């Protein structure tokens, strides 16, 4: 959505619903998300725990914020939409293009696009707004805006062509940012965001020297990954087929690691330091942002907003009479309950993958080692480990 002046001659920045002033906004129809909040909840989670590693005018936020609205177009009701800001130069504090010297400084790339037809080999559109870096690895150039050029693509090309070791990744990326992004994928099972699509890559100023003796200056040349389009999170599917207790994503945390993901994550998998960072970060976040209580609270906040305002019922009633309709559920409370059950199991799978000590202990009166005692997740002692599923042994949650 673009805001214009009254005579439509120019763009018009404006604050909407308490969000930062912009001329271009996102109106998300959430057409494949049956609860109309997955992207918003997942982005709220990201913003809560993963700030940019530098200061900005927006509290170092790298994800969008949004407000839910009921949409009317030419007096025709369209249901619930999410109005949100964009990931852009101002949000990420990227250095603006130098028009005087015609110099590219800050760059922002968006992964995944249909704007370029040939995605089998490296090529670019004539206006330099989109390009394919490698086989089925297409990007859009979002910054510099209005000054797209070949020079702006060189940093991305250089990363893919020449920075292929783990030491390179540590030098050219913020490892903690990569760890946070991978945990987001693992914890919320966001399979649609682990390949060559649905994320941003930004560099504050490509004119800076990555080898500068001043680490603050060198950091301005490092790349940041920001998430985008998270509507397959929390058990969701790309076609809206997961609902009513059935069909939710069963992509296990271990599968995320085995898959490897796209560059630069594919290079990090298997690195001891990186694995240790993932485990330590999960151990920290499982009691805060990713706790069952915290995730449930975010789901229930938007559930209550939709129900108490009457917006959900209005949307359900409206689309009952329409031939073309988005994916919806009539009973939102019931569906949120199913998703909370899904996340409770996902949380336990994350604990099992990382070998997190649950704090469950037993007292024995014989000489049998505690490590040989096996319990169900309900606390019942078992004679042997189950053939499949979760169980507790030696105070640790395990999985077969």
Tell me the role of every PLM-derived stretch.
Residues 2-32, 48, 53, 62, ...:
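Internal "kinase-insert"/substrate-recognition segments embedded within catalytic cores
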Residues 38, 42, 48:
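Phosphate/pyrophosphate-binding loops and the adjoining catalytic core of nucleotide-dependent enzymes
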Residues 352-381:
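Residue-level detector of functionally pivotal "anchor" positions at catalytic/ligand-binding pockets or at interdomain
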Residues 390-400:
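C-terminal tail/sorting-segment detector
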């Amino acid at each position: 959505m673009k805001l214009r002046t009254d005579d439509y001659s120019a763009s018009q920045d404006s604050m909407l619903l308490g969000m930062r002033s912009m001329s271009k906004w996102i109106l998300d129809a959430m057409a494949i998300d049956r609860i109309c909040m997955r992207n918003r909840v997942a982005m709220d989670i990201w913003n809560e725990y993963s700030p940019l590693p530098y200061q900005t005018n927006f509290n170092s936020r790298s994800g969008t914020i949004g407000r839910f609205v009921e949409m009317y177009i030419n007096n025709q009701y369209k249901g619930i939409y999410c109005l949100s800001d964009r990931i852009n130069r101002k949000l990420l504090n990227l250095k603006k293009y130098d028009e005087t010297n015609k110099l590219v400084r800050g760059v922002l790339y968006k992964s995944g696009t249909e704007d370029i037809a040939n995605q089998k080999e490296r090529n670019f559109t004539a206006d330099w707004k989109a390009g394919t870096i490698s086989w089925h690895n297409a990007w859009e150039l979002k910054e510099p805006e209005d000054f797209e050029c070949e020079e702006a693509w060189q940093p991305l090309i250089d990363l893919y062509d020449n920075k292929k070791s783990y030491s390179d990744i540590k030098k050219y990326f913020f490892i903690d940012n990569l760890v946070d992004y991978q945990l987001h994928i693992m914890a919320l099972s966001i399979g649609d965001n682990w390949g060559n699509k649905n994320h941003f890559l930004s560099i504050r100023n490509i004119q800076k020297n990555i080898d500068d003796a001043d680490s603050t200056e060198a950091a301005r040349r490092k790349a940041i990954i920001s998430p985008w389009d998270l509507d397959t999170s929390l058990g969701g599917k790309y076609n809206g087929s997961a609902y009513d207790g059935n069909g939710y994503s069963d992509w296990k945390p271990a599968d995320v690691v085995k898959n490897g993901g796209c560059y630069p994550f594919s290079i990090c998998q298997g690195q001891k330091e990186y694995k240790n960072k993932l485990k330590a970060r999960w151990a920290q976040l499982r009691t805060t942002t990713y706790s069952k209580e915290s995730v449930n609270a975010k789901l229930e906040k938007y559930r209550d907003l939709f129900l108490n305002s009457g917006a959900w019922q209005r949307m359900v009633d409206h689309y009952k009479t329409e031939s073309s309709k988005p994916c919806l559920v009539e009973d939102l409370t019931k569906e949120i309950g199913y998703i909370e059950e899904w996340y409770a199991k996902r949380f336990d799978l994350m604990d099992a993958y990382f070998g997190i000590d649950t704090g469950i202990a037993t007292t024995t009166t014989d000489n049998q080692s505690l490590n040989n005692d096996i319990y169900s997740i309900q606390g019942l002692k078992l004679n042997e480990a189950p053939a499949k599923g979760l169980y507790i042994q030696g105070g640790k949650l395990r999985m077969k």
